């Protein structure tokens, strides 16, 4: 059985390793001949763990300030300089209530059992007892590691691809399809990964699109032909049906709110009369009586009431699984043809996505112009012969703000990283916001632009919605995760960028700025379009996405 001390050393070695191959080799060498491979891999990937601990960084600080009898304010101030694991380690070492162990005695199994128990309680008194109990058997470094597991970020600079491909060269790709970590590890030991398929009622990583800034680029990407599909301004939904059971998952593989999808339980059996089990990729949109899509955000309970005679409508664009048959390795044109054969449209309830077979550039331009004229979001372009590759950005999306050559071809989904005090009537409140993106290579957050122009009501709401730490433009208080140049140091930084809001930012064009840290990329005349509540930081525009977006 692997000890927590061994696991901590592995994490340290992975962090200091220079690249993908070296990190994966370290993991592969470590798990070889160990019986608890699954547990090791599971804990190396805490972000994939579906256990919920009901506490963020601020709550962890609050609870441990009570346990250690330390100043909560001092602990929060220390957190502003780094991250939660270091803060807890520092104050555990200094506290006089619980003496840290001199020698590590915990196994990974002990830690995993603790995490399971912690996920089952919600009362603060119960959480305090459990956190006290685990601290009493930890060294300072042990507790730091446990807290980072609760926070679901070990900061080892190694994501799922690095870790899973240490098991087998194609384990990561298989995982994105099956989403079953235990099955992958068991089958890898038997060299039988190819047998793993989609499991109905278990979410699949959705296939994604990268931004496209020209019609010419689209034809270079798909020289053998493409489908142009309307990009619906709704919410991505993966539909699973197994006999009379249903499951609905969002783009980040979380359950969709029931009020948005409950109606589908009545209509899916009518639209797919021959299907016993099925998995669909689709978009749910609120439409009017003429099946015209209504604005994004109208799916909410209160917002929907503003639109009389409206209906929830499922626009189906792919069939991934049908009655025991995994269809993801079949070319798109065959999947689409099959979908046409097995699905019966129910007007305003379940319909096919609008799809056009494109053969030349002028046709694509016409289809794009038509979509924008109808005030639709744009187009998604798909290889006509393409297979469905879970989690991969093989499609292209065009949703232009401006049609003129050289103008910004797409908006960017950026994360709120900080804020500045406003001036004049807006003095004393956060009125200007620092927007940025995540750099997968460095594990840091980089700045892209500042954004303002919100109305008074929106600003009033944002003061409460955004969880900020006041740093008063002090360079010494810039958190470890943020890379920002001196002239853009904000008055406030977000407590946790991975929990921050994602805003769609549009502008006249992408520009070069030596002052911003996202490879010098910025946005000219940035403007806030909307909050992307349907996305997590993982689906936001990362630095590599931004670089691709600016290439013409």
Swiss-Prot record:
Requisite cofactors: Mg(2+)
PANTHER family: DNA LIGASE 1/3 FAMILY MEMBER, DNA LIGASE 3
Key word Metal-binding present: yes
Active site: 231 (n6-amp-lysine intermediate)
Source organism, top-level taxon: Viruses
A GO cellular component entry from the record: host cell cytoplasm
E.C. number(s) listed in UniProt: 6.5.1.1
Binding site for Mg(2+) 2: 377
InterPro entries referenced in this protein's UniProt entry, alphabetically: ATP-dep_DNA_ligase (IPR050191), DNA_ligase_ATP-dep (IPR000977), DNA_ligase_ATP-dep_C (IPR012309), DNA_ligase_ATP-dep_cent (IPR012310), DNA_ligase_ATP-dep_CS (IPR016059), DNA_ligase_ATP-dep_N (IPR012308), DNA_ligase_N_sf (IPR036599), NA-bd_OB-fold (IPR012340)
Function summary: DNA ligase that seals nicks in double-stranded DNA during DNA replication, DNA recombination and DNA repair. Recruits cellular topoisomerase II to sites of viral replication and assembly. Contributes to the repair of the viral genome following UV irradiation.
Protein transport keyword on record: no
Binding positions for Mg(2+) 1 per the UniProt entry: 283
GO molecular function terms noted in the UniProt entry: ATP binding; DNA binding; DNA ligase (ATP) activity; metal ion binding
Family, as annotated: Belongs to the ATP-dependent DNA ligase family.
Compartments where found: Host cytoplasm
One biological process term in Gene Ontology: lagging strand elongation
The protein's name in its UniProt record: DNA ligase
Annotated organism of origin: Vaccinia virus (strain Western Reserve) (VACV)
Chief subcellular location: host cell
Binding site for ATP: 229, 236, 283, 382, 397
Catalytic reaction(s) noted: ATP + (deoxyribonucleotide)n-3'-hydroxyl + 5'-phospho-(deoxyribonucleotide)m = (deoxyribonucleotide)n+m + AMP + diphosphate
Subunit description: Interacts with host TOP2A and TOP2B.
């Amino acid at each position: 059985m692997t000890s927590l001390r061994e696991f901590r050393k592995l994490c340290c070695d992975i962090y200091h390793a220079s690249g993908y191959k070296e990190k994966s080799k370290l993991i592969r060498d470590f798990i070889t001949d160990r019986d608890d491979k699954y547990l090791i891999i599971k804990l190396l990937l805490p972000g994939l763990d579906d256990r919920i601990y009901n506490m963020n960084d601020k709550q962890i600080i609050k609870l441990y300030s009570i346990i250690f009898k330390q100043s909560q304010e001092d602990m929060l101030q220390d957190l502003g300089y780094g991250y939660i694991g270091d803060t807890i380690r520092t104050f555990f070492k200094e506290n006089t209530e619980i003496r840290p162990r001199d020698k590590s005695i915990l196994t990974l199994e002990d830690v995993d059992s603790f995490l399971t128990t912690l996920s089952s309680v919600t009362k603060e008194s119960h959480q305090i007892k459990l956190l006290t109990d685990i601290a009493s058997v930890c060294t300072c470094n042990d507790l730091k590691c446990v807290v980072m597991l609760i926070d679901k970020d070990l900061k080892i600079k190694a994501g799922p691809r690095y870790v899973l491909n240490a098991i087998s060269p194609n384990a990561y790709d298989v995982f994105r399809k099956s989403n079953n970590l235990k099955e992958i590890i068991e089958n890898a030991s038997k060299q039988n990964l190819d047998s793993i398929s989609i499991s109905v009622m278990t979410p699949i990583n959705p296939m994604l699109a990268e931004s496209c800034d020209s019609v010419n680029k689209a034809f270079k990407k798909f020289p053998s032909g493409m489908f142009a599909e309307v990009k619906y301004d709704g919410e991505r939904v993966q539909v699973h049906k197994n006999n009379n059971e249903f499951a609905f998952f969002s783009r980040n593989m979380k359950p969709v709110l029931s009020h948005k999808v409950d109606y589908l339980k009545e209509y899916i059996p009518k639209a797919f009369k021959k299907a016993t089990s099925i998995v669909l990729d689709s978009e749910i949109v609120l439409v009017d009586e003429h099946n015209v899509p209504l604005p994004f955000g109208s799916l909410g309970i209160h917002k929907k009431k503003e639109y009389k005679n409206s209906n929830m409508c499922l626009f189906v664009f792919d069939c991934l699984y049908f009655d025991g048959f995994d269809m993801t390795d079949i070319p798109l044109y065959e999947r689409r043809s099959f979908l046409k054969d097995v699905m019966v449209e129910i007007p305003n309830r379940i319909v096919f996505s609008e799809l056009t077979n494109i053969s030349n550039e002028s046709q694509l331009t016409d289809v794009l112009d038509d979509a924008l004229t109808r005030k639709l979001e744009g187009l998604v372009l798909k290889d006509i012969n393409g297979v469905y590759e879970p989690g991969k950005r093989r499609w292209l999306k065009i949703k232009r703000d401006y049609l003129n050559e050289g103008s910004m071809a797409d908006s960017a989904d950026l994360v709120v990283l900080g804020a500045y005090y406003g001036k004049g009537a807006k003095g004393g409140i956060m009125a200007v916001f620092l927007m940025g993106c995540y750099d997968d290579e460095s594990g840091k957050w980089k700045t892209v632009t500042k954004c303002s122009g919100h109305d008074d009501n929106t600003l009033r709401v944002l003061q409460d919605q955004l969880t900020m730490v006041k740093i008063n433009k002090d360079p010494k208080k810039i958190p470890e995760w943020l890379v920002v140049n001196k002239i853009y140091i904000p008055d406030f930084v977000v407590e946790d960028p991975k929990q921050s809001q994602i805003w769609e930012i549009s502008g006249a064009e992408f520009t070069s700025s030596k002052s911003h840290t996202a490879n010098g990329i910025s946005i000219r005349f940035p403007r806030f379009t909307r909050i992307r509540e349907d996305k997590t930081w993982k689906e936001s525009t990362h630095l590599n996405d931004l670089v691709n977006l600016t290439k013409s």
